[in-house]
Amino acid sequence: MNLNELRDNEGSRYRKKRLGRGIGSGKGKTSGRGVKGQKAREGVSLNGFEGGQLPLYRRMPKRGFVNIFRKEYAPVNLGAISKAIESGKLDKAATVNEEALRKAGLVNGSKLAGVRLLAHGELSHGVTIEVAGASAAALAAVEKAGGTVKVLETKKEAQADA
């Protein structure tokens, strides 16, 4: 048997039945929806309803919660900073902080707690970076390139120290 000899089984494919086209069509008048009621109406499907069987969302246990105090940090990779310096969007002599990263287009979004520095990519310039957080690998990579990273304290940490 070859690929060009493959065929569907006889009778396995049907033409779709057009609905509401007379009694002789087999799907006329009510189009297989029965008579009246909620399910006969247009646009109705009961999400999560499984015909009286206990639905999945009730069978599963409740777990977890949403932390309303969760802080969202914008990730910025070293490779992106390096590329921005080479293209002239960032000045390697100046301190690279959140404001500079926003102007360069590397960070956007208003509800962020700050910037987190990550180590993806190579940093070819010794720069001073001020961020809210940084990975250990990113800190090592910046220091290896001859730069420094200052991890800023949050307001809560500053109050705890005082």
Swiss-Prot record:
Gene: rplO
Biased composition (Basic and acidic residues): 1-13
Database matches in InterPro entries: Ribosomal_uL15 (IPR030878), Ribosomal_uL15/eL18 (IPR021131), Ribosomal_uL15/eL18_sf (IPR036227), Ribosomal_uL15_bac-type (IPR005749), Ribosomal_uL15_CS (IPR001196)
Gene3D superfamilies, alphabetized: 3.100.10.10
Keywords: Ribonucleoprotein, Ribosomal protein, RNA-binding, rRNA-binding
Residue ranges with Gly residues bias: 21-35
Name under which the protein is recorded: Large ribosomal subunit protein uL15
One CC-aspect GO term: cytosolic large ribosomal subunit
GO MF: rRNA binding; structural constituent of ribosome
